[in-house]
């Protein structure tokens, strides 16, 4: 299973996987507007991969089969100040 990978110029560390290079017809317009102009990164064969960076390989394959695309976004950043406040008992929430 080949997939083309693009990175977002608007959203840091966000990647869009599509079935065919430069074919974004299955990607919803609101998502494309949020993602911005895609920048081509690479074409990869998912069948020959055991791992795929931070994305779950089976989830990517399923999304490509069902929707025709997969959006990989970075995990949410930790709020270190909030975590420190909780550890020190200073958080009133």
Swiss-Prot record:
InterPro entries reported in the protein's UniProt record: YcgL-like_sf, YcgL_dom
Provenance organism: Pseudoalteromonas translucida (strain TAC 125)
YcgL domain sequence ranges: 1-85
Origin: domain of life: Bacteria
UniProt protein name: YcgL domain-containing protein PSHAb0508
SUPFAM superfamilies for this protein: YcgL-like (SSF160191)
Lineage: Bacteria, Pseudomonadati, Pseudomonadota, Gammaproteobacteria, Alteromonadales
């Amino acid at each position: 299973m080949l997939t083309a990978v693009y990175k977002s110029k608007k959203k840091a560390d966000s990647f869009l996987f599509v079935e065919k290079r430069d074919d974004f017809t299955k990607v919803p317009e609101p998502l494309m507007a949020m993602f911005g102009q895609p920048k081509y990164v690479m074409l990869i064969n998912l069948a020959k991969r055991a791992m795929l960076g931070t994305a779950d390989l089976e989830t990517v394959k399923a999304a490509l089969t069902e929707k025709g695309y997969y959006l990989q976004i970075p995990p949410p950043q930790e709020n270190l100040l909030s975590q420190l406040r909780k550890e020190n008992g200073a958080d009133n929430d």
